[in-house]
Amino acid sequence: MQQDYSIPTGKELRIAISGASGCGNTTVSSILAKQLGIPCINYTFRNLAQELGLPLEEVIAQAKTDFRFDRLVDERQIERASQSSCVLGSRLAIWMLKQADLKVYLYASAEVRVARIFQREGGTLDGIRNFTAMRDRDDTRRYKELYNIDNTDYAFADMHIDTEHYKPDLIVELIIDELLRRSLILPREAE
């Protein structure tokens, strides 16, 4: 597939995209990385659970008291993101990837997030609503205890995008427009 954009010669580009579960983080990060022709790094508790052969719920439950899981996920993400140009999509990307050229925070209401997770994973709406609320609380507490990060304070991000009102492709267009505005990427014909 021919890429429409390029990174200026001799430069690298690192984009950090964060948001709570159901905000479109993984989808937007994947589409953006594909359009830019750079790797997408989205290593999560879900990946770690698969790697360890454990159910996701068990990893999440153990992570409440054992910070080893967070550290493993975060170390692997930062290690991979430090190697080359990439899009890093994770809950803490905008806080952890200090060298990111662009930091984007995606958000949506709890009800929209729950509906998206329900559509993606199935289950019951009440079960997902309760699990998502618990996970949000636990994530906020753990990040504060582990890294002294308040994941409810994302004012420093370069872009804040309400994903309730935009489809993933349009969100990617908004991010690409900002990358072009900052001269972090160039239209292919400008090479």
Named regions from a protein language model:
Residues M1-V59, R68, S82-Q83, Q99, ...:
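Glycine-rich phosphate-binding loop of ATP-dependent small-molecule kinases
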